[in-house]
């Protein structure tokens, strides 16, 4: 009798485990989380965010499963993300099959701030049990917001004022600054017209070329965001910024073919570095009159031709730049 009861109990436990495994295999989990169709992006607009993911099954290939609800949670740190009461925003459980470009509907997010987020979904088994409970939370992802128009304190600088021709040699800007402690995080926001290349302590920050994107400079100027903490150290540090004309300053050259010409002004740059130290304090470094300008190694540049000299990229000394906003520019994007 005892043996029969034991066997019955074993079979019952096995059946429950099988049911549990089957139910677990029929729960979808968000994976490959994206913000604005990018993975862990830097410099996203804080009020126009969209969230996306793909659906992952614990036992592929899954069939007859679909999402019927979702929940998104955002926080300022991974520790806060794990505690619901400390979340910056929680969407709550939303009945929806959408998992593509879901708009953010919370309060205004802080500019130049890194946020962490995760999602979970509810699964419907179309030929079986119907709706079941929400599944596990996804692995965390992150995004970093851009600067808003009120957060810019840097000034546009140029080697010469607009309207004054300083010859074909393009400028290089140099600036030395000191960091008082070890760095926890550092965000660099930069634009250069028409194009720029930024070096920090001798290392190239810009991993792409022809930055920033071409735009109607009378209305919009684009800028880029970089995370540069690994390039910084306590004590003295140095910036070097190389500028190019791009499509911002295309001038006719005697004896050379020009598809089109047009100038919005002299090459110029705008840079803002926001540093947070390990002790919790912060510091900011901007382009201003303390920077030094030098004649750069590029002695002639057009969209289809470049002439480079062999002089050093950044020399000591130099002259202070002039402060000059882009002609007609109304906003940064």
Regions from the PLM with identified roles:
Residues 1-5:
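Positively charged n-region of N-terminal signal peptides that target proteins for export
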Residues 8-18:
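Bacterial N-terminal signal peptides
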Residues 20-25:
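Boundary at the C-terminal end of the N-terminal hydrophobic targeting segment
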Residues 53, 58, 93-102, 114-118, ...:
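Accessory beta-strand-rich segments of carbohydrate-active enzymes
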